[in-house]
Design a protein with these regions (language model features):
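Long, intrinsically disordered low-complexity tandem-repeat segments
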Residues: 609-668
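Alpha-solenoid helical-repeat scaffolds
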Residues: 363-555, 559-566
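"A position-specific structural signal for the A-helix of alpha-solenoid helical repeats
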Residues: 5, 22-25, 39-42, 73, ...
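TPR/TPR-like (Sel1-like) alpha-helical repeat modules
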Residues: 210, 223-251, 741-767, 800
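Generic helix N-cap/helix-start motif at coil->alpha-helix transitions
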Residues: 1-3, 140-148, 177-186, 198-199, ...
């Protein structure tokens, strides 16, 4: 038996009897501590009393309340069982249990020790100078040893009650204890509540967040209660105060803003590997090349200037400096946007013995930390440690790494470098006092320290990792905490809108889907746009259309209108799409994308219904909406089935997805068929040529024109345009597929085969890059499509066009074999 065999009956069906039977079997099978057995006996006796009362025919008006209270007691006992399972399974919890036995973790006992430490430190000012330093170091070392034991004790502490939670909250908010101690204990409770969802520990963190006036303590408590929220809301719902607390906190706009900032920063942390790769590949080589220092076996020395360099090329130094400044600015811009630019470098510096202790990963940086004793001696007379503590731009974890590393190489440094350690220039751009007090900066710094722990701690798999975007294994969490059902409420909808925009910009479609599922019942028109992305990604255009249509007419936003127009185009309701684009153009008469989309819709109107599958040319029926951009008209995927519309979505219902599958406005117009006079189509044609005249170098317009040429049977003209498109650096894989169709339809089969092979190669390259990016972010990626599958899928989507111009199903099958060079019959 296990924790989950007790837990599931409770949260799924509130079945106390089944949970107690499972717990009885667990006690019989495993040697559990006496306090768990005692708790089980108490709950069992309470439940038997209820049963006995019912057997005697007694009626209790509060029977439901009593049953719920017993349910909560069983839940608490099940959490204690979970702690014991972790102690047996994971070394970190086993060590914590051993260490905890030496420490009394009752709030009153803890308060006595922490307040005594503050008083003793104050009394050090009256000690003689010749003994003060030694006594302070001993006092600090003893206190650190106590805090280490207390941290471990809290990690494996049994489930609290409301009284203990309130006492600890009062203690951590008390001005009579050291702030660093309060910060460390907040982290200890957070780590405990993350791995064993004790609602009372969670409530203590929330209470500290609400009442704290110290910004650093407040933000650490924010991170604590957010990360210890469970993804499954059923457990916490047994405790009404959890929902009440969440509702009260979310009523505060400042809290909402801080949560949104925290969510975005967590996603930046998850992208640390990709950011590090960008820095190592495109920035660091330039910075290293232009440095005048080199490492030798004797230490760091300055390189001699090359006297021939200025003679051969007198402008080299200036160019090198400009290039170095440009790369450096790029790195600083990445940092300002939220990127964790220091992770790559400092991740190699977490092997010091300092990081063997669990609590040190969460310790605020303090130059007086006992583990920095050797560093203080080697840096005696230097202000380096104080500068690092006050102005260093790194998170606390990296500050410790930096201090320990500098101390190791201090003896091998040139004198001028040692002198530089006394200045702020050592750290590059320092952090101003105002920035250090900014809640967003405080939160970012703490999250970066946490990210390093969950990525680099030697026993990291002992703990749930909140920086994972997919639940890949049992000990992984979900970094997208704003998709938790416990937080889904009207107050959070504006945050959800802002976050979805952030995710969309980064093409994080899986995360948008998670948000959409969480807020599927919302009627917020700005949020509906993102909710519709889920069915749009699956090609469920009617479902997406219904979502947009559910928005009252007078509440439509520009974004929801764009999404609705896109659905209309995909559903071939071109008349309705025309009306919506005219409405959008009334808002923005000069909008290029709206004009281009209107032109395609006009050319695809009902007046050309005789064309068969008339111009689904903007049919993004395969749209995965992955890069839906409110203002984009990315016709890069114009054409062919290729239009998997990775470039279109709810907001960019654009001509970008003009595809072959959708034979377009004149799809039935073969080489010898003349278009019938039609004012609507004529308007579309004029508008298209107008856009081409005004934007002669716009690839999107050229793609639409090329597509129209092919649809009308003017294959030579289409080939000419596609040839020019393919010669441009911004050519996309879809251009090759469309060009292949044009050559195939003109019976230049050899060239078509070559282009189709190039198309397959590019698609495989794009899939490999997407898979690598997903791997770095810890996310799952879609299965790779085989060439056979891809071509069959494309040809099937584009069957109407190919059939109209005489390419039969048999020819399509043979073409697939030719492209694949299949010879095994």
């Amino acid at each position: 038996m296990s924790f989950y065999e007790i837990y599931i009956p409770l949260i799924a069906k509130h079945n106390v009897g089944k949970a107690l039977r499972a717990m009885k079997e667990t006690i019989a099978e495993d040697k559990l501590p006496g306090y768990i057995v005692a708790r089980y006996e108490d709950v069992k006796n309470d439940y038997r009393l209820m049963q006995d009362a019912m057997m005697r025919g007694l009626r209790d008006d509060k029977i439901d309340e009593v049953y719920d209270d017993i349910t909560r007691k069983v839940y608490g006992a099940s959490l204690d069982v979970l702690i014991e399972e972790k102690v047996k399974k994971y070394s970190s919890f086993a060590y914590a249990r051993t260490s905890a036995q030496q420490t009394e973790a009752h709030p009153d006992a803890v308060r006595t020790v922490l307040e005594a430490y503050v008083q003793d430190m104050a009394m050090m000012a009256f000690e003689p100078e010749n003994t003060r330093k030694a006594k302070m170091e001993k006092l600090t070392a003893d206190h650190h040893a106590y805090m280490k034991q207390l941290f471990n004790a809290l990690l494996v502490a049994p489930m609290w009650n409301d009284r203990r939670a309130a006492d600890f909250a009062d203690l951590l908010l008390s001005p009579t204890i050291d702030r660093d101690d309060a910060l460390l204990l907040v982290s200890a409770v957070m780590l405990a509540a993350m791995n064993v969802n004790d609602p009372y520990k969670w409530d203590m963190l929330a209470e500290v967040y609400v009442r704290a006036t110290d910004k650093v303590l407040k933000m650490r408590a924010l991170v604590g209660w957010v990360l210890s929220l469970p993804y499954d809301p059923r457990g916490p719902r047994l405790f009404p105060f959890v929902q009440e607390r969440i509702k009260a906190m979310l009523a505060d706009k400042t809290t909402l803003k801080q949560m949104l900032d925290m969510q975005m920063q967590m996603l930046f942390c998850c992208n640390a590997d990709a950011d590090n790769e960008e820095i190592q590949r495109n920035i660091m080589p330039t910075l290293i090349k232009n440095t005048n220092l080199q490492m030798t076996r004797l230490g760091i020395v300055e390189k001699e200037d090359d006297p021939m360099k200025d003679i051969m090329d007198p402008n080299t130094a200036e160019r090198d400096m400009e290039e170095m400044e440009r790369k450096y600015r790029k790195m600083m811009d990445m940092q300002k946007q939220g990127s964790d630019i220091y992770f790559g470098g400092f991740s190699k510096m977490k092997t010091f013995p300092f990081f063997y202790d669990l609590c040190n990963w969460f310790a605020p940086f303090n130059a007086a930390h006992p583990a920095l004793g050797a560093a203080r001696e080697r840096l005696a007379g230097s202000t380096f440690l104080n500068n690092l503590m006050e102005n260093g731009p790194f998170c606390d974890s990296d500050k410790y790494s930096f201090a320990l590393a500098i101390a190791q190489i201090m003896d091998r440094m040139p004198d001028n470098i040692k002198e530089m350690l006394n200045s702020d220039a050592t750290f590059g751009p320092t952090v101003s006092k105002d920035d250090q007090e900014d809640p967003a900066y405080i939160c970012r710094s703490y999250l970066q320290s946490l990210y390093r722990f969950f990525r680099l701690y030697r026993s990291k798999r002992d703990f749930l990792n909140p920086f994972i975007l997919d639940e890949l294994e049992d000990n992984d969490g979900n970094a997208l905490f704003m998709s938790y059902k416990l937080l889904a409420c009207p107050e959070m909808e504006e945050n959800a809108v802002a976050l979805c925009g952030f995710l969309l910009k980064r093409k994080m479609m899986r995360e948008i889907m998670s948000m959409a599922i969480c807020y599927k019942s919302s009627q917020n028109p700005r949020l509906v746009r993102f909710l519709a992305l889920v069915p749009m990604t699956d090609g469920k255009w009617q479902e997406a259309y219904d979502l947009f249509a559910s928005v009252p007419e007078d509440q439509h936003t520009e974004e929801s209108l764009r999404g609705m127009a896109h659905c209309c185009m995909s559903l071939k309701r071109f008349g309705e799409a025309v009306a919506i684009y005219r409405r959008l153009l009334a808002m923005h008469p000069d909008s290029f994308s709206y004009q281009l989309n209107l032109a395609v819709c006009l050319m695809s109107s009902d007046a050309f219904s005789s064309c068969g599958d008339a111009a689904s040319s903007c049919d993004a029926s395969s749209c995965d909406a992955s890069s839906c951009d409110a203002s984009s008209c990315d016709a890069s995927s114009c054409g062919a089935s290729s239009c998997d519309a990775s470039s279109c979505g709810a907001s960019s219902c654009d001509a970008s997805s003009c595809g072959a599958s959708s034979c377009g406005a004149a799809s039935s117009l073969g080489g010898k068929v003349e278009a019938r006079p039609n004012k609507v189509v004529e308007e579309g044609t004029k508008l298209l040529y107008k856009l081409d005249y005004e934007h002669p170098n716009n690839a999107n317009v050229r793609r639409v024109l090329a597509w129209c040429m092919m649809l009308q049977g003017h294959f030579d003209k289409a080939i000419d345009i596609y040839t020019r498109l393919l010669s441009q650096p911004d050519a996309v894989s879809a251009d090759r597929l469309n060009a292949a169709y044009a050559h195939w339809l003109s019976r230049d089969v050899a060239r078509a085969v070559a282009l189709l092979r190039e198309y397959c190669n590019l698609c495989e390259q794009e899939e490999a890059e997407a898979k690598e990016a997903a791997k770095k972010q810890g996310r799952r990626c879609e299965p790779t499509k085989s060439r056979n599958y891809r071509l069959v899928e494309d040809f099937t989507k584009d069957a109407d066009l190919l059939s109209k111009y005489g390419i039969s199903l048999t020819e399509r099958k043979i073409m697939v074999d030719i492209v694949l060079n299949e010879e095994e019959f």
